[in-house]
Design a protein with these regions (language model features):
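Patatin-like phospholipase
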Residues: 1-57, 65-305
Length: 305
């Protein structure tokens, strides 16, 4: 029996062109601020281009999947119809699931029951996909790739992306393949070093903060150490997160000044909340991403003609 979805299915499509080897796409996270990145991806899909190497953190890794599967406007439908629901993000979820974000709703119910996810198109793309998660025991960023998106039964599996998205203090630790993981942004918010290490010589960096943003210390050190007393590496990384973030941001800006990177980011401050459910604000952010993505696409096509 054919699966029934509550929304009209959006079939995936293959890209018209994959950019040359050595061009990497770097995607910051940021919770629902990540719908800015989804808007940029919409512009890339509109132009039919796909990057040969994609590395993302948290929401950046998650939103990139609809881009790789070529499902235009899928992320926009999620903003319009599902982000406002309490199952997506709410304090109620903390009581029910011990997590602000409803990860079962986001990673299982939406793609399986509401807006189908085109695994066939995603899994056949000849690109390198990398989702970063924080290993709570070692304190290192672990990278999950294409093979991790395919479960033991051969079907699509989003558990590795869930591990990348599990926001500290707001979410439960994710058990996956013998490890314990939280949001990759704890130690690697902007995965530019991963893109460099994997051999890329030009990087398109999508940020979810405006130019001039400097990440402040998280604070509440004693509370964090108590909360993660069983996982001291998590507390240590959270205490230095702002320093690492600002260093990664500086590296991106230095590369851009050298002509080795292109940065796409919101033009105005977008607020501190990663849990905003204001549809008007999020759609405005999405549309801004699409507009800036179109400009970036024109530059990319000229550069790699």
């Amino acid at each position: 029996m054919m699966k029934k979805y509550t929304e009209t299915p959006i079939p995936g499509r293959d890209p018209q062109r994959i950019l040359p080897s050595g061009v990497g796409l770097v995607c910051e996270g940021g919770g629902t601020r990540g719908f800015f990145s989804a808007g940029v991806f919409e512009a890339f899909m509109e132009a039919g281009i796909l990057f040969p190497h994609i590395c993302g953190i948290s929401a950046g890794a998650a939103n990139a999947l609809s881009y790789i599967s070529g499902q235009r406007l899928r992320s926009r439908q999620i903003v319009e119809h599902y982000v406002p629901r309490h199952e997506y993000v709410s304090r109620r979820n903390i009581l029910l699931h011990r997590s602000m974000f409803g990860y079962d709703f986001i990673f299982r119910e939406i793609p399986e029951e509401h807006i189908f996810f085109d695994w066939d198109v995603l899994l056949r793309q000849p690109i390198s996909y990398n989702a970063g998660a924080f290993d709570c025991n070692t304190g290192e960023t672990v990278w999950f790739g294409n093979n991790d998106l395919r479960g033991a039964d051969g079907r699509g599996d989003l558990t590795c992306v869930l591990a990348s998205c599990s926001v500290p203090l707001m979410s439960r630790i994710v058990d996956y393949k013998g490890g314990k993981y939280l949001d990759g942004g704890i130690h690697c918010s902007i995965p530019i070093e991963k893109s460099i290490a994997d051999g890329n010589d030009f990087h398109v960096v999508i940020l979810t903060r405006n130019e001039g943003f400097v990440k402040p210390p998280m604070g509440h050190e004693k509370l964090i150490r108590m909360f993660y007393r069983k996982y001291p590496k998590v507390a240590e990384a959270l205490e230095t997160r702002h320093t690492v973030y600002n260093q990664q941001l500086e590296l991106c800006e230095n590369l851009a000044a050298q002509g080795r990177a292109m940065i796409i980011r919101p033009q105005a401050p977008v607020g501190d909340s990663r849990t905003s459910t204001d549809v008007t604000v999020l759609l405005r952010l999405y549309d801004e991403g699409t507009d800036l993505g179109r400009t970036a696409t024109s530059e990319l096509l000229k550069r790699f003609a």
